[in-house]
C-alpha cells in the first residue's frame, strides 16, 4: 500500500516534469528521486534537474519571483499613469501626445501579456505549458516589443520634423499621427505573424516538447528579418535623427552666441524649427529640447541687430511662440535689449551669455543621450544574442540569455519615465492624479 502511494506520487512528479519513468533511478530508502541521473540520451539539464531541489534553489527562485513581480508592477503602474494623465488632463490631449499614449499602451501590453508568463518561465526554468501557448507567447512578445521600439522611431521622427520644419507643428494633425501609429502596429504585426504562419526552425517543436524550452524561432532567415525590422534599422534611424536634432540645437545656440559678440545684444533664435516651442509635445522631451534651444520672447518673433540698434518685427502669431504643451514660460537666459528687460527685469542678473549657452548645449547633449542611451543599453544585448546564436550555433549561458531578455523588458518600465519626466505638464498631471484636483496647474506669465 505504501509502495502504491509512493508510485502514485512518483507518477505525478514524472508527469509534471515529463520524465520517462523507466529511465529514472531511485534511492533505496524511499520514493525520492535521484535528480543527478541522466534520464535519456540527448536530454538536457532542463529535464534532468528539479526546479527547487534544494532549499537554496527555493530561496533563489522566491527572490527571483519577488524581483520580477515588482518589475512587472512598476511597468504597469508607470504606463497606466501616462495613459490616465493623457486621457484625463485636457491640456495633454494633443496629436503629438497620441504617440506617447500609443507607446504606453504597447508597454502596458508587454507588462500584462508578455512579462508574467516570462516570469513564470524564468522562475520554474522550464516550459510546461505546451507548444501552442509557447507559440502565442513568443509571437505576442515579438508584437508588443517591436511596437514599443517602433513607437520610439515615430516619436523621433515627429520631434525631428518639428525641429526642422516650422509648418510641421500646425500640420501635425490627429490624422497624420494616427497614420504613424497605424504604420507602427502594422509593421509589428507582420513581424510577429511570420512565426505563427510557420517560419520556424526544424527543431522548434522538439525544443518545446522535449527540451521544455520556449524561445522564438531560431531560423536564420527569420532572425535576420525580425532583428533588422525590430531593432537594427530602428536604432540606426533613431541615432541619425537625434544626432541631427542635436546638431540643429547646437547650431542655433552658437549662432545666437555669435550674434551677441557682433552686436552686443543676442537676438532670440528664429530658425525654421523655432515653432517647436509652440507644439513639440512629443512626450515632454521635445519640449525639453526646446528649452535647450531657447524660447523666443513672447509676441516677438524676429529681431535684427545692426550696430547698437534693435529692430523688432511682430509678424508671427502668438500661438507659434507660446508653449502649446503647457510648459512654464521660463525667462530666457540671454538679453534682448530694453524690451526684453521690460518683460524679464531679472535678466540683468543672469550669468554671462557664453556660460549660459554652453550650459544649454550640454543640456541638449545630456537630454538626447538619455533617450538614445537608455534604449540602446536595454535592447542591444538581447538583439546581439538573437542574431548571434542561430548564425554561429554558439552556446550561450542561460543566465546571460535571461538577463538580456529582461533588460529589454525593462525598457518598457523606463519609457514612461524617460518620455514624461522632462515635461512639467506631465509631472503636474501625475501630482493631480495622486493628490486629487486640489493641485492647481501653474500658468505661464501672460
Curated annotation (Swiss-Prot):
PROSITE patterns: G_PROTEIN_RECEP_F1_1, G_PROTEIN_RECEP_F1_2. It comes from the Eukaryota. The chain crosses the membrane at residues 66-88, 99-120, 136-157, 177-199, 228-249, 368-391, 400-422. InterPro entries: GPCR_Rhodpsn, GPCR_Rhodpsn_7TM. It is found in: Cell membrane. Residues 304-324 have a biased composition (Polar residues). GO terms for cellular component: plasma membrane. This is 5-hydroxytryptamine receptor. The lineage of its organism: Eukaryota, Metazoa, Ecdysozoa, Arthropoda, Hexapoda.
Amino acid at each position: 500500500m505504501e509502495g502504491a502511494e509512493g508510485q502514485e506520487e512518483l507518477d505525478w512528479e514524472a508527469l509534471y516534469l515529463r520524465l520517462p519513468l523507466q529511465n529514472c533511478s531511485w534511492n533505496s530508502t524511499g520514493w525520492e528521486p535521484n535528480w543527478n541521473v541522466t534520464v535519456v540520451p540527448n536530454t538536457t539539464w532542463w529535464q534532468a534537474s528539479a526546479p527547487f531541489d534544494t532549499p537554496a534553489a527555493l530561496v533563489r527562485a522566491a527572490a527571483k519571483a519577488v524581483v520580477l513581480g515588482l518589475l512587472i508592477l512598476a511597468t504597469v503602474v508607470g504606463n497606466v499613469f501616462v495613459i490616465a494623465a493623457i486621457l484625463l488632463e485636457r491640456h495633454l490631449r494633443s496629436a503629438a501626445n497620441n504617440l506617447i499614449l500609443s507607446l504606453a499602451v504597447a508597454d502596458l501590453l508587454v507588462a500584462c501579456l508578455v512579462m508574467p508568463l516570462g516570469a513564470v518561465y524564468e522562475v520554474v526554468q522550464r516550459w510546461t505549458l505546451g507548444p501552442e501557448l509557447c507559440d502565442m507567447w513568443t509571437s505576442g512578445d515579438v508584437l508588443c516589443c517591436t511596437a514599443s521600439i517602433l513607437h520610439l522611431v515615430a516619436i523621433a521622427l515627429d520631434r525631428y520634423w518639428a525641429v526642422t520644419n516650422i509648418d510641421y507643428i500646425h500640420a501635425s494633425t490627429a490624422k497624420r499621427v494616427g497614420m504613424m501609429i497605424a504604420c507602427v502596429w502594422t509593421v509589428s504585426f507582420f513581424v510577429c505573424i511570420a512565426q505563427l504562419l510557420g517560419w520556424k526552425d526544424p527543431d522548434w517543436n522538439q525544443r518545446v516538447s522535449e527540451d521544455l524550452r520556449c524561445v522564438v524561432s531560431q531560423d536564420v532567415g527569420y532572425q535576420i528579418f525580425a532583428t533588422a525590422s525590430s531593432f537594427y534599422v530602428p536604432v540606426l534611424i533613431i541615432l541619425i535623427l537625434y544626432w541631427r536634432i542635436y546638431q540643429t540645437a547646437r547650431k542655433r545656440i552658437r549662432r545666437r552666441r555669435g550674434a551677441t559678440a557682433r552686436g552686443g545684444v543676442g537676438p532670440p533664435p528664429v530658425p525654421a524649427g523655432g515653432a517647436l516651442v509652440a507644439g513639440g509635445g512629443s512626450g515632454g522631451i521635445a519640449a525639453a529640447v526646446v528649452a535647450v534651444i531657447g524660447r523666443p520672447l513672447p509676441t516677438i518673433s524676429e529681431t535684427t541687430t545692426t550696430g547698437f540698434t534693435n529692430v523688432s518685427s511682430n509678424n508671427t502669431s502668438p500661438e507659434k511662440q507660446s508653449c502649446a504643451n503647457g510648459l512654464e514660460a521660463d525667462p530666457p537666459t540671454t538679453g534682448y535689449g530694453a524690451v526684453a528687460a521690460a518683460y524679464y527685469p531679472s535678466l540683468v542678473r543672469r550669468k554671462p551669455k557664453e556660460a549660459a549657452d554652453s550650459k544649454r548645449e550640454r543640456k541638449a547633449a545630456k537630454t538626447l543621450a538619455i533617450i538614445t542611451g537608455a534604449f540602446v543599453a536595454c535592447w542591444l544585448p538581447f538583439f546581439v544574442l538573437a542574431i548571434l546564436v542561430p548564425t554561429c550555433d554558439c552556446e550561450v549561458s542561460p543566465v546571460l540569455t535571461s538577463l538580456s531578455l529582461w533588460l529589454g523588458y525593462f525598457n518598457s518600465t523606463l519609457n514612461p519615465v524617460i518620455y514624461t519626466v522632462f515635461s512639467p505638464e506631465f509631472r503636474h498631471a501625475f501630482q493631480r492624479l495622486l493628490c486629487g484636483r486640489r493641485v492647481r496647474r501653474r500658468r505661464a506669465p501672460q
